[in-house]
Amino acid sequence: MVTNVGEQLKKQPVLRGGGFTFKQFFVAHDRCAMKVGTDGVLLGAWVPVLHARRVLDIGCGSGLIALMIAQRSLPQVQIDGVELEPAAAQQASSNVELSPWAERIHIHQQDIHQFAENHPHQYDLIVSNPPYFAPAIACRDEARDTARYTGSLTHDTLLNCAEKLITEDGMFCVVLPHELGIEFARLAGQQGWFVRCQVDIRDRPGKPLHRMLLTLSRQAGETVYQHLALRQSEGVYSPEFCQLISDFYLNY
């Protein structure tokens, strides 16, 4: 009996500093401008992976979303992450190497424009947690600018690159602040994309909408509209959010 308890303890994730410990992997982010946050976790837990065979994460940062998709998807699924900022790309590579899915995830330190022009593969699932601040007021940190501000990757450019890289019936999924999500969907429609799913997110019931998850496709079809509150009125995580994160967050 003691031996069994000991074996169980060995399997428990080891909590470490400089990053975020999930049930099956650790994401170091101390060298990344943008840290692990709810936006990335939402996208990684939500995107439809059932029919995916080749996945692309544009602006992969620490590798968080790529790792979450690897955990959720079939063993034969191959995942590419593209990251412009050298330190973040290096850290993403390290996170991947230490994960259970090192053979399935490949990190490319490259500009997405060059990647889109030269990469031979197309993807049936593309994901991105893109920059969303206008470049009017820059940060002091150039790497943080790259991660946060659209000057390095405009939404127009993101849509154009995704169009070049997606399969005919592929899905393109993003997470954005709600107001920008509305604008992103409008811009996508002008470029021939169709919204197939939209999730409007608020922190808790009665609070303003603050995030949006979008699934876009080049193929027309029914649009599914959903709502998600991250917390209940008393402040605890909602059952719907717990269901999303239960395979990832410790103690859920």
Curated annotation (Swiss-Prot):
The EC number of this protein is 2.1.1.223
Major site of localization recorded for this protein: cytoplasm
- Kindly list the places in or outside the cell where this protein is found, as annotated in its UniProt entry: Cytoplasm
Q: Which UniProt keywords apply?
A: Cytoplasm, Methyltransferase, S-adenosyl-L-methionine, Transferase, tRNA processing
For this record, an example GO cellular component is: cytoplasm
Claim: Methyltransferase is one of the keywords in the record: yes
What is this protein for, i.e. what is its function? Specifically methylates the adenine in position 37 of tRNA(1)(Val) (anticodon cmo5UAC).
Q: Which HAMAP family match?
A: tRNA_methyltr_YfiC
Protein family per UniProt: Belongs to the methyltransferase superfamily. tRNA (adenine-N(6)-)-methyltransferase family.
Name the UniProt record assigns to this protein: tRNA1(Val) (adenine(37)-N6)-methyltransferase
